[in-house]
Amino acid sequence: MNENERKVVVRRMLLLIAVACIIMGLYTFRLIFLQLVNGDSFKAKATNTTDYKFTVTAARGNIVDSTGKRIATTSTGYNVVLNKLQMGNQDLDTMLQQIVELLRQNDEKWLDTLLISEPDAAGNYTFTDSADSTSDQKTLADMKETLGLQQYATANDVMEMLVEKNQLESFSLPWQRVLAGIHYEMDRQAFSNVNNFIMAENVSQVTVATIKEHSLTLPGVEIVETSTRSYEQGDILPAVLGRVGKITAEKWKVTDENGQVTYPLKEKGYNMNDMIGISGLESVYEDELRGKDGVETITRNSDGVIVDTKITTVPEPGHTVQLTINSDFQRAVDKALANNIDMINRVYNTGDMKAAAGAAVVLDVKDGSVLAAANYPSFDQNLYATNYSEYSADPSLPLFNRALQGLYTPGSTFKPAVAVAALDSGLINQYSTVNCTGVYTYYKDYHPRCTRHGHSGNIDVVTAIKWSCNIFFYDVGRRLTSDVYDAYAYKLGLGQRTGVEVNEAVGRLTKKTDKNYTSSLDIQAAIGQGNTVVSPIQLATYAATLANNGVRYRTHFVKAILDTNTGEVLSETQPEVMDIIEGNGNTFELVRQGMTLVPSTISGKISSYPIAIACKTGTPQRSETYASGKHYLNAMMIAYLPADDPEIAIGITVEYGGYGARTGDLVVDIANAYFAMKDGTLEVDPYVDPRTVAQEDAAASDTAAQTAPDAANDAQTAAAAAEPQQTTVPAGVTEEENNDAMLAQ
């Protein structure tokens, strides 16, 4: 390189260096400007974010039995949820159509509470509300008011407004109805940047996978785990446990008599789409079971980009409610009651009216704890939603909680109460007698009778209870008057609430103020007829009070409230004395003696049971009659055992059961189950979810269809080899119970 060329290169390099220095200077100046002059402004812009808070629903607490076995629990379900923050500029209705199609592919339902039908062939709509539902009527009224319509607006008017409001004119009529229903649900759930929208609940795993496969075309559509109520033992106390469900319109928006609107559940932290206890223990213990919801915070910057998602408040599960019942013992009592009713029908009720229903309640005498409360027929919590129509149409009323809400004439089971009243008041003593001639002739125009089964002549109170002598209790009841013996019956637990946590029938006693009162009604009431009606749980409470020598405890289902995570006892139900009859000397001992002799008058297992049982049967008349004019009869029973040191008390009713003594074997079966439970040898068939059985049956039927010829051959072979089976029939019932039905006409 010569000198000239070298100078050219140097000049060029110097020029490049100068240009680079100028550029660097400009960058440095710009950086200084940004940092020092506008630094605060840009920093604020960079950190300009918005936090959005979403509720994380807490798991509902469990309901367990006295041993800790779960009855009602929380399981994981999956909801299809729309998050408005993450949807971006996606066309909402197009996305909704896509989601609906995916749900339809998998036979899933989406939330649609709009009370309007699909369009008919002419494009017209009708309301689908129930005329008997005040909730539906209020929902329709609120919807019309919100849309600015008059209350006489038709379903077509409402749909027209919904289509216009949500700009659905371009869609076909069927799609207008679908999308209008979804938009209505969005409004109901207050869908917004801070409120996600639950579009479908408890979807299958197949649907979960389907939605996730289409996640790229469904921004903001999420699969969210949720807690759902499930029943590991759906057959245990379904009517007492109650149900959970959606918050209804009338509970969410409450209008008082002055027209003032309040939202009490919202003020307690509920959302419109939350689940809540709506009946039974689920409702009574809602505050304990509900738990505390958590909070998820999503942070979005000024450009709309989500920069952070975190749980800022961890949800706390609800507390566990522990019951006093042992689920195995409850199931054993359920089975014993069903077997007893079946036996009555097979052996005795061979005519036109079968024993189709009943109840049996077992209490712990020491503290009033409910050990079992059986209803027959009953229902399964796991089938309630799908089988509700069938249950509600069943004439045997499986949804009716007979144990707590059924009211029945007590019949001769009432006689021990009259005996207590007479002894405690001093009207009679252990030596007092009444001459039973078979006919009570005190009144000139009314001569009720007694069968004199096993007795006649002068009898004392112990003998009168043993043989259920009507004449004795007619005379004693007349001399006492209903005012006196009713007061004692009330203190013993009849005709009033027992104190259980859930809804129960009050019942009533026969009063002199009754419109149909006569002197004859007064003595009828003394043998448990008249206007007196009581519930099975009252009978059990009454029996327990007799066993406790006049001390009546509050009857209760709940043993304790537990911390779900640790099992720590947070509170425990203590025995609560509700009333006391002091007793005049040996009042309760004499009644006990009479009741302990009753089993010897009854055929069957109870007469030879190795443990002494104190009991009293009852056979009250029903209003219905045979063609001959003879009244149908219920079978009633109270009992406690062991008679000398009572542990349990029992109250039983069987509708159309005939004589009360027919429930004697049921008392023995309950006693056997109780003692087996105590020593750990009680064995019962485990609960099988009927939904699982249905699925297995469906699969089996598919297999059977392919093997029908072989099955038919096997059936013929089995039939040819089968030998006749002999049914063992219990000994006939020969007890005193005709006395209950022997009221002079």
Identify the function of each model-found stretch.
Residues A72, Y78, T299-E316, I325, ...:
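Beta-lactam-recognizing serine transpeptidase/beta-lactamase-like catalytic domain environment
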Residues M1-V314, T350-A359, A699-D702, D710, ...:
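Membrane-proximal periplasmic segments of bacterial cell-envelope enzymes
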Residues E683-A700:
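Short, highly charged C-terminal tails/helix-capping segments
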